A protein has these predicted regions:
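Acidic anion/phosphate-binding donor-loop and adjacent secondary structure
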Residues: 150-151, 162-183
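Aromatic "clamp/platform" in nucleotide-sugar-dependent glycosyltransferases that forms part
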Residues: 252, 271
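N-terminal strand-loop element at the rim of the active site
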Residues: 5-65, 145, 160, 230-232
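Conserved donor-binding/catalytic core segment of Leloir-type glycosyltransferases
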Residues: 4-6, 185-203, 209-212
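Short hydrophobic beta-strand element within catalytic cores of glycosyltransferases
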Residues: 288-291, 301
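Conserved acidic donor-binding segment of nucleotide-sugar-dependent glycosyltransferases
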Residues: 303-304, 308-315, 324-329
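Short, structured helix-loop element that forms part of the nucleotide-activated donor/catalytic region
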Residues: 41-47, 223-245, 250
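Short His-centered aromatic/hydrophobic patch
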Residues: 85-92, 110
């Protein structure tokens, strides 16, 4: 089976992380081509398997009818059985999806909150056009994500495939990472919180930093590690400036599992998500999770077992969950460690579900 994966770019992000892992895993048994459309930062590109054919289109950022036509021509040249695109590529694939629907099977993975991002506007229009006129099949990535889509678009074919991630592989840097984190700690009892996400308003990082400023000023023995890009931008740097001592911005890292392994708890403060890849990485690393009640997190985190979900997006609610974790830290950490080998979120399981779904549509078309 010849599969074409289409992505905007390979900068740091959950969709980008999934695409690389998915391509690598599927290429073990299938013919996989990865089409990268835009000229943006390709952080994950070195991690793409040699088994995957990579095509870089070098399009300029923005939307144009010419890009729609170029996508149409590229797909015909590649001639795949499957065209699988992701939410960042939605506008570039509309024309191809409609005109080539009888020749190829088109799929779109929804990586974000459906209610907030696909109910109306251009994104909602795109889903309707591809679903109604292009016969596109949709993949949702968490139970809540699935139910939201089913409610809004009951006539469109969709399937739930939870996001997957390659199992933890530690690098030669793990010992130096351990020493680095130890140097940040006040003493051996310091609780290490870690937040992995690029800077973006939807991540609600301003609230997160305000909260940890308060926590540290109240002499709670903890530190916060922030890993991700974008904090060097004008808006991101303002958050950095507000952070007190005990909050460390470490930039992007390609050895994220080394940092998770040496942290005590993962924290997410987002306003909306689809199924955060960072939560899956935390689960597979065996560390507890504290999160706001976003799509995906509410499906993966069981209150009082592998972490806590705050009752709302407000700072006081989030604080209550953090303090509850500190109170029950040992039992929560033990449960998370014992249940880290969760095949539900392993990329092997995820990729096999994609392959099975793809093959079922090829059979129907024939």
């Amino acid at each position: 089976m010849k599969i074409l994966e289409v992505i905007y770019g390979l900068s740091t992000g959950g969709a980008e992380r999934l695409v690389v892992d998915l391509c690598n895993e599927m290429s073990k048994t299938e013919d996989v081509t990865l089409l990268i459309l835009k000229e943006v930062n390709h952080f994950y590109l070195p991690q793409v398997s040699p088994n995957v054919k990579v095509i870089q289109a070098h399009w300029k950022i923005g939307f144009s009818i010419m890009q729609q036509y170029k996508a149409y021509k590229l797909i015909k040249e590649i001639n795949p059985d499957i065209v699988h695109f992701h939410n960042s590529e939605r506008y570039s694939m509309i024309l191809s999806n409609i005109l080539l629907k009888k020749k190829y099977s088109f799929f779109m993975t929804i990586h974000s909150d459906v209610e907030k991002n696909y109910k109306k506007g251009l994104s909602g229009l795109q889903v309707k056009l591809c679903g109604l006129l292009g016969g596109c099949k949709f993949i949702t990535i968490s139970e809540t994500n699935y139910l939201q889509f089913q409610k809004l678009y009951p006539k469109f074919q969709q399937i739930l495939i939870e996001n997957g991630r390659a199992l933890p592989q530690f690098t030669q840097q793990i010992d130096s990472v351990k020493k680095e984190i130890e140097s940040y700690k006040k003493d051996h009892n310091t609780i290490v919180f870690i937040h992995v996400a690029r800077y973006h308003p939807c991540k609600n990082q301003e609230m997160l930093i305000e909260f940890f400023n308060e926590l540290i000023s109240e002499n709670i023995n903890c530190i916060l590690l922030v890993i991700g890009s974008g904090f060097e931008t004008d808006k991101g740097s303002k958050i950095v400036e507000k952070a007190n001592k005990g909050i460390y911005f470490l930039g992007s890292k390609n050895n994220i599992y080394d940092y998770l392994k040496n942290s005590d708890v993962f924290c997410l403060s987002s306003i909306y998500e689809g199924m955060p890849m960072s939560i899956i990485e935390a689960i597979l690393s065996g560390i507890p999770i504290i999160s706001t009640p976003v799509c995906g997190a509410i499906d993966a985190v069981k209150n009082g077992y592998n972490g806590f979900i705050s009752s709302s997006f407000e700072k006081e609610s989030y604080k209550k969950s953090i303090l509850e974790f500190i109170k029950h830290k040992d039992s929560i950490s033990d449960y998370s460690e014992k249940n880290k080998n969760n095949s539900k979120y392993a990329i092997t399981n995820c990729a096999q579900k994609y392959i099975s779904f793809f093959k079922s549509t090829i059979h129907k078309k024939k």
